[in-house]
């Protein structure tokens, strides 16, 4: 067994229970599970916690639309989340729910403690509120008048609230981040937090709400419910035994957390709010917060209305659990967003899982049965190419250790497949089928098959954290077991004389895209049908196309005011993402004989590639202004639906660039 290296407490963000998680949401639990399994193999005593975040205004509104209570709603969604987490073979130790009685009780105590010691005070809040993000913003923080996080519409809000004195701890947090370079990873996330939030100065944080009731009541002022982030973030301590009145031995053993694994969109909450809450509670900070990138559906936003959402259970039905795990782990870069499409999944399945891995195992076991009745023996008859094979195989473990220490999981799994590629090359170099024709080469053939079997055993053991079912199937076919981590840099431990299975199983049979496509079409059609039903329920029996949106009327303008605005048709020549923004695209728009640069907050709904060539409606004579440091010389006209999805306004018929809109 690997030497016990002590505890390793890791968490995912708890999933918000507003709906069924898609594959982009599921990526996080698969990534976390791979890390947890790897750490266990290394010899750590891992405690892996995940769960669901179940309070907030958005959930209350969704429950009302569904005609059920918020608790019934979150019970359904939390159950669905847990089902999917289990489906993808995640080995968590604790699945938490923020509606659990012990959590709610502890949150009340935490709020009271912070209030009693003067870190929380009562006041009132007036600002702009984003319901999906459950966040307040000042006018200056908005981007194009919309939420800087999600790009949706915000609403003015004023209410009595309790506030946390963030500024009291800001300098201390800045010092901590500067002296603990691994605290926020990747480094780009750290720079974003420092430059965009901490260094400009923190405002006090609203930590209670009165405009809705679905939350944990403030004990001493029950018309207030605890703000969702103070509620949700504290699960990392409440569910392992923290108590302001005296914590358990488990808490003392596990805290501080070794790793919070979260999506890049909630880094701010985990690296600013959370550490400041912990400082106020006089608790140590987590050792590392890692903000992983997103998994996007092609170049497009996942949307049920488009039928392009990919769910983990659909992927598992079509490709299997480990193929699903392999794709999301292998295709996600360290910092940049990854891309998933059905075609890419099929391509990766066939090239890597079927050709490289499945074919290797099947050929090796089949040749052992064909030439030696399945008995694998080391004869010591070596060849020139053996040394290089052994060097590659025995060096792989340490290369993986290096990658995993930096949480470069995609690179680590690529190292395992580099080992399998080397094995396939070894088959081509040694040509066992040729050796089998020469009785004098029988011992050499036996050694070749032993080397392959030993290499595959090591590779399967290294693969186990990432594809556990596949790794176990491989060693079962080789009639052995997974190798101890400390032994994975040694060659020759496969027991001499072992008999492999005489009925090798095809691990991954190649997939014909033409056979899969009808199933994908059915999935997409079902999504669109479900979307229409949901919209009909939300819109009082109307379909999405029949639904209407009422807006509060704005101040009337005169005809003269209107004629001051110049609207024309433009053609987008080129488009690129604005480097300093997650929401903005910068387009070069041809309007007649003029080209204008226009910055728009539509990145969540359009990719730069989608924009090129579109005919759009443009407000041409808008006063130029800089957005995220980039000059914008006009405005593209869009419509926004009830879900905040933007659609560019385009002419119905073909009209030339520069045509007047009147």
Regions found by a protein language model. Give the residues of each.
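Intrinsic disorder at enzyme termini
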Residues: 474-561
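N-terminal catalytic cores of NTP/NDP-binding nucleotidyl/phosphoryl-transfer enzymes
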Residues: 2-77, 96-111, 116, 133, ...
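Cys/His-rich short segments
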Residues: 117-170, 174
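Structured secondary-structure scaffolds
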Residues: 2-50, 102-106, 150, 156-370, ...
């Amino acid at each position: 067994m690997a030497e016990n290296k002590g505890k390793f407490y890791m968490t995912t963000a708890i999933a918000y229970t507003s709906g069924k998680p898609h594959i982009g949401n599921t990526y996080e639990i698969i990534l976390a599970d791979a890390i947890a399994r790897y750490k266990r193999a290394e010899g750590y005593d891992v405690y892996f916690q995940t769960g669901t975040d179940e309070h907030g205004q958005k959930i209350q509104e969704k429950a009302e639309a569904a005609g059920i209570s918020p608790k019934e709603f979150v019970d359904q969604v939390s159950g669905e989340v847990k089902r999917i987490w289990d489906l993808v073979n995640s080995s968590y130790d604790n699945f938490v729910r923020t509606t659990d009685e012990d959590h709610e009780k502890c949150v009340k105590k935490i709020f009271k403690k912070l209030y009693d010691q003067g870190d929380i005070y009562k006041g009132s809040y007036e600002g702009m509120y984003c319901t999906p993000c459950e966040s307040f913003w000042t006018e200056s923080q908005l981007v194009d008048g919309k939420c800087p996080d999600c790009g949706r519409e915000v609403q003015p809000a004023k209410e009595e609230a309790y506030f946390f004195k963030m500024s009291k701890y800001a300098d201390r947090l800045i010092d901590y981040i500067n002296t603990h370079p691994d605290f926020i990873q990747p480094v780009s996330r750290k720079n974003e937090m420092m430059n965009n939030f901490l260094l400009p100065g923190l405002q006090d944080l609203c930590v209670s709400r009165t405009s809705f009731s679905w939350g944990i009541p403030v004990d001493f002022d029950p018309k207030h419910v605890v703000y969702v982030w103070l509620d949700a973030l504290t699960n990392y301590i409440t569910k392992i035994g923290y108590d302001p009145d005296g914590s358990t031995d488990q808490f003392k053993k596990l805290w501080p957390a070794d790793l919070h694994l979260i999506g890049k969109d909630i880094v701010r909450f985990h690296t600013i709010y959370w550490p400041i809450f912990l400082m106020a509670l006089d608790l140590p900070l987590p050792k590392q917060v890692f903000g992983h990138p997103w998994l996007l559906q092609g170049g497009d936003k996942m949307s049920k209305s488009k039928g392009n959402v990919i769910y983990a259970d659909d992927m598992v039905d079509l490709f299997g659990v480990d193929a699903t795990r392999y794709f999301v782990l292998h295709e996600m870069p360290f910092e940049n967003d990854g891309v998933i499409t059905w075609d890419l999944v099929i391509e990766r399945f066939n090239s890597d899982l079927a050709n490289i891995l499945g074919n290797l195992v099947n050929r090796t076991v089949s040749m052992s049965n064909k030439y030696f009745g399945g008995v694998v023996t080391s004869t010591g008859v070596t060849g020139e190419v053996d040394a290089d094979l052994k060097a590659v195989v025995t060096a792989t473990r340490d290369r993986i250790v290096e990658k995993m220490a930096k949480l470069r999981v995609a690179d680590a799994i690529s190292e395992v497949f580099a080992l399998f590629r080397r094995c396939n090359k070894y088959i081509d170099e040694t040509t066992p089928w040729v050796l089998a024709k020469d009785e004098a080469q029988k011992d050499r053939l036996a050694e070749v098959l032993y080397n392959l079997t030993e290499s595959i055993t090591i590779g399967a053991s290294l693969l186990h954290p990432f594809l556990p079912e596949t790794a176990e199937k491989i060693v079962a076919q080789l009639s052995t077991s997974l190798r101890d981590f400390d032994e994975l840099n040694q060659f020759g431990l496969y027991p001499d004389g072992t008999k492999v299975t005489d009925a090798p199983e095809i691990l991954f049979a190649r997939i014909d895209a033409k056979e899969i496509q009808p199933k994908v079409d059915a999935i997409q059609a079902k999504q669109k049908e479900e979307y229409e039903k949901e919209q009909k329920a939300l819109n009082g029996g109307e379909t999405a196309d029949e639904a209407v949106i009422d807006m509060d009327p704005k101040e009337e303008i005169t005809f003269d005011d209107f004629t001051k605005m110049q609207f024309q048709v433009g053609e987008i020549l080129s488009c690129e993402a604005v480097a300093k923004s997650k929401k903005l695209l910068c387009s070069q728009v041809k309007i007649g004989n003029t080209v204008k640069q226009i910055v728009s907050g539509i990145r969540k709904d359009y990719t730069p590639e989608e924009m090129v060539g579109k005919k759009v409606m443009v407000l041409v004579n808008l006063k130029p202004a800089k957005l995220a440091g980039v000059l914008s010389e006009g405005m593209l006209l869009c419509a926004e639906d009830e879900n905040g999805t933007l659609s560019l306004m385009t002419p119905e018929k073909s009209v030339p660039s520069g045509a007047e809109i009147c």
